[in-house]
Amino acid sequence: MQQDSHTHGIDMSALGRNKQSLRMAEETVAIEVPGLSLFYGDKQALFDVQMNIPKQRVTAFIGPSGCGKSTLLRTFNRMNDLVDGCRVEGAINLYGNNIYRKGEDVAELRRRVGMVFQKPNPFPKTIYENVVYGLRIQGINKKRVLDEAVEWALKGAALWDEVKDRLHESALGLSGGQQQRLVIARTIAVEPEVLLLDEPCSALDPISTLKVEELIYELKSKYTIVIVTHNMQQAARVSDYTAFMYMGKLVEFGDTDTLFTNPAKKQTEDYITGRYG
């Protein structure tokens, strides 16, 4: 006999959500968003978003197109600064320091918070020079140091075995999936603390997607990862926590398993069961 979730007057679904709230409360916070709004000119795109991104976990942002998930992701390393008329109100604290404070070194911030985009964007250089690009910008040119960085970054991106004999060939000769893993290697070569992935698999075939998903799982032992995805199955597979956004607002944020199986908000349930989106 199926038991009612309100057995003996106890709301079991609420108990489950309380348990996951406790789990989140125990996590070390990498990125704290105490209240963030964002405007493009007069148009408001984000409305008082409040959340804590846990350290060395994978957090996924889901929601329909235009809901603000990529906009929010890009606030974490101030990529929105490059958009004319963009204005942010509020704060984002990276390990306790507000990245929007006056005098923030944005170049250093973007080293600490690396970003991988939807479409693989290798530079028209050799595989080797792609990986060391950020290191050379930092003034690191010692061959031994660069050689070591290339090997560990490519190993870290699960690409070394496929390219170790062609490091001095053009990166443009790689497949789409290999190019995306190369971009991840280039990003981790400068030793960031956070990786932002903006739909990193949307341009890839299923086999390449699986390799990138496996890589994300491996990388979270060293990095805090935030991924935007249109693919709810992908969010369920790779993330520890999921945030559902709708029309610029954070509707629900919590443990991925709980959010997908026992959402607190009807709006979340409607989205994940395909009623809209």
From Swiss-Prot:
Keyword line: ATP-binding, Cell inner membrane, Cell membrane, Membrane, Nucleotide-binding, Phosphate transport, Translocase, Transport
Membrane topology of the entry: Peripheral membrane protein
Highest rank taxon of the organism: Bacteria
Family: Belongs to the ABC transporter superfamily. Phosphate importer (TC 3.A.1.7) family.
Subunit structure of this chain's protein: The complex is composed of two ATP-binding proteins (PstB), two transmembrane proteins (PstC and PstA) and a solute-binding protein (PstS).
Gene Ontology BP terms: phosphate ion transmembrane transport
Binding site for ATP: 63-70
Role, per record: Part of the ABC transporter complex PstSACB involved in phosphate import. Responsible for energy coupling to the transport system.
PANTHER family in alphabetical order: ABC TRANSPORTER I FAMILY MEMBER 17, IRON EXPORT ATP-BINDING PROTEIN FETA-RELATED
Subcellular location: Cell inner membrane
Encoding gene per record: pstB2
Any Pfam family matching the protein: ABC_tran
A molecular function GO annotation: ATP hydrolysis activity
Stated name of the protein: Phosphate import ATP-binding protein PstB 2
Gene3D superfamilies: P-loop containing nucleotide triphosphate hydrolases
InterPro entries from the UniProt entry: AAA+_ATPase, ABC_transporter-like_ATP-bd, ABC_transporter-like_CS, P-loop_NTPase, PstB-like
Gene Ontology cellular component annotations, sorted alphabetically: plasma membrane
